[in-house]
């Protein structure tokens, strides 16, 4: 295998041997991987989203499901129930009266769960930032993974946010968050 001096030669030899074995098996049509990599790959390609459309951003969110953008080609399918959803898209102005309902729906989602905050109102209160009845960002109620800016953001911006979420899942994994 490899010639190396030092205390960690066994680990280096194992890595070299694993790489050689993987090359030999790939030629025969096999693949070596870990269970965590397979789970991350499957979760990344089959995210189920739930809408929490509160205002005009929800119209742009609907555009992503239409044939022109077709977000389902990325494995991002809509679900009606929070118990079947991995991702919640908060789109629009979140009021103080609606905040407990948002938290309740978030708590019903299974782990790992992700939140996309869509639009200026969901990100930080937007146009209604100084109103007495508006929550100044949904991140005060639920943890947000991806922020999509704009008033309202375009469907392309939401698609980019979805792709960034998939990239984040690939990078961080899903078993231990």
From Swiss-Prot:
UniProt KW Membrane keyword: yes
Main enzyme class: translocase
Keywords: 4Fe-4S, Cell inner membrane, Cell membrane, Iron, Iron-sulfur, Membrane, Metal-binding, NAD, Quinone, Translocase, Transport, Ubiquinone
InterPro entries listed in its UniProt record: NADH_UbQ_OxRdtase-like_20kDa, NADH_UQ_OxRdtase_20Kd_su
GO molecular function per UniProt: 4 iron, 4 sulfur cluster binding; iron ion binding; NADH dehydrogenase (ubiquinone) activity; NADH:ubiquinone reductase (non-electrogenic) activity; quinone binding
EC number: 7.1.1.-
GO biological process per UniProt: aerobic respiration; electron transport coupled proton transport
Named cofactor requirement(s): [4Fe-4S] cluster
Main subcellular location: membrane
Pfam families cross-referenced by the UniProt entry: Oxidored_q6 (PF01058)
Cofactor note: Binds 1 [4Fe-4S] cluster.
Subcellular location(s) of the protein: Cell inner membrane
Subunit architecture: NDH-1 is composed of 14 different subunits. Subunits NuoB, C, D, E, F, and G constitute the peripheral sector of the complex.
Protein name per its UniProtKB record: NADH-quinone oxidoreductase subunit B
Organism, as annotated: Rhodobacter capsulatus (Rhodopseudomonas capsulata)
